């Protein structure tokens, strides 16, 4: 495709994507706002009111913003591919005793793959979002880099580590060099109708934040109760189904042995949740798979990095080493709490995203 200044902005009806659309228009881009219709909850009222970027209210907010700033606006249907790539993945991972991050899957398969395809269909060279991240081209490396946002408290590079060089060429992140409070101030000064709208906190398609209920309603198999066992295999009691538990969990176990117990492992094959004491939740080695690298073409030798094992975690010193099958071995300098299969581990070199992958398992 020939390079042009037409950009499709993914508009969720929130303040960030709204300001992103405005900034791009001010920079001279031909901006087309698009809200992705991705999920229809069975509870129509919940979707209308609470459904985050999936709700009918979000569509109305995005349309009002588009009218206010004077850009074209469309709603596009992504329901089928979203169900396949995000919903089914989310449910299947929990059934396997793992804890997925659906936002990472949504970014990988929907926002920066499917939306980009739609953008190209209407001859738009770029796709933009309201993510807090910076894209730069490094002449020396001959690669696009993904770097942390100026607002480190809002940085979203953790959920963007899957981006490819081709995708990065066609992506714009207008908010990367803005602080969140400045974005809100800008929205307020512009009179945008979403200026005071709170940020969404929950997973957009689980409107009541009840993961267990959502998985039961969407699973193709029955959720069966099973056994709690300790790390030596001794029976401790019964659980209500592995979908209700995640590594490091303490609340809601219903088991008392005099000392606090935590979930330290989930054996989906045998429907067993393994409980242990506080020190047994920690580990310093893991293996990741489905790895993607951004600042380098591929990991060919041992490399010292900062790594984080969940969105809210702090970066920790670690060494990463390539394995023969494309997986990566990660060794932390210090033990990490609750290394959780299904979550992602992301590697940093200063403010540059090296890459990342999905945690397969804790080694020790």
Swiss-Prot record:
Organism from which the protein derives: Caldanaerobacter subterraneus subsp. tengcongensis (strain DSM 15242 / JCM 11007 / NBRC 100824 / MB4) (Thermoanaerobacter tengcongensis)
Protein's UniProt name: tRNA-specific 2-thiouridylase MnmA 2
InterPro entries tied to this protein: MnmA-like, MnmA-like_C, MnmA-like_central, MnmA-like_central_sf, Rhodanese-like_dom, Rossmann-like_a/b/a_fold
Keywords for this protein: ATP-binding, Cytoplasm, Disulfide bond, Nucleotide-binding, RNA-binding, Transferase, tRNA processing, tRNA-binding
Keyword Cytoplasm attached: yes
One of the GO biological process terms: tRNA wobble position uridine thiolation
Annotated compartments: Cytoplasm
GO molecular function, one term: tRNA binding
Active-site residues (renumbered): 106 (nucleophile), 204 (cysteine persulfide intermediate)
């Amino acid at each position: 495709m020939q390079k042009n200044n037409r950009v499709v902005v993914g508009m969720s009806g929130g303040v960030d994507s709204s300001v992103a659309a405005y900034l791009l228009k001010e920079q001279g881009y031909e901006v087309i706002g698009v809200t992705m219709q991705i999920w229809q909850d069975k509870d129509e009222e919940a979707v209308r009111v609470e459904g985050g970027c999936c709700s009918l209210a979000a569509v109305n907010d995005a349309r009002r913003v588009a009218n206010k700033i004077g850009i074209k606006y469309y709603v596009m249907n992504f329901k089928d591919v979203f169900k396949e790539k995000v919903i089914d993945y989310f449910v299947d991972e929990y059934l396997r005793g793992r804890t997925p991050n659906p936002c990472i899957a949504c970014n990988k398969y929907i926002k920066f793959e499917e939306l980009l395809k739609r953008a190209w269909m209407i001859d738009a060279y770029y796709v933009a979002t309201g993510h807090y991240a910076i894209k730069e081209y490094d002449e020396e490396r001959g690669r696009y880099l993904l770097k942390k946002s100026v607002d480190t408290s809002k940085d979203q590079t953790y959920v963007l580590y899957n981006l490819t060089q081709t995708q990065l060429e066609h992506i714009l992140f207008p908010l990367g060099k803005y602080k969140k409070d400045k974005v809100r101030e800008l929205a307020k000064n512009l009179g945008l109708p979403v200026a005071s709208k709170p940020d969404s906190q929950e997973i957009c398609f689980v409107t009541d934040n009840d993961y267990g209920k959502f998985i039961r309603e969407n699973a193709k198999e029955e959720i069966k109760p099973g056994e709690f066992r300790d790390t030596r295999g001794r029976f401790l009691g019964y659980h209500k189904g592995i979908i209700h538990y995640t590594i490091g969990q303490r609340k809601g176990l219903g088991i008392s042995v005099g000392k606090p117990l935590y979930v330290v492992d989930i054996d989906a094959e045998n429907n067993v949740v393994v409980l242990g004491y506080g020190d047994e939740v920690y580990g310093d080695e893991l293996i990741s798979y489905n790895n993607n690298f951004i600042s380098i073409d591929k990991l060919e030798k041992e490399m010292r990095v900062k790594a984080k094992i969940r969105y809210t975690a702090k970066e920790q010193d670690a060494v990463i080493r390539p394995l023969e099958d494309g997986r990566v071995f990660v060794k932390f300098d210090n033990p990490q709490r609750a290394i959780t299969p299904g979550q992602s581990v992301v590697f940093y070199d200063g403010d540059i995203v090296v890459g990342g992958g999905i945690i397969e398992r804790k080694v020790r």
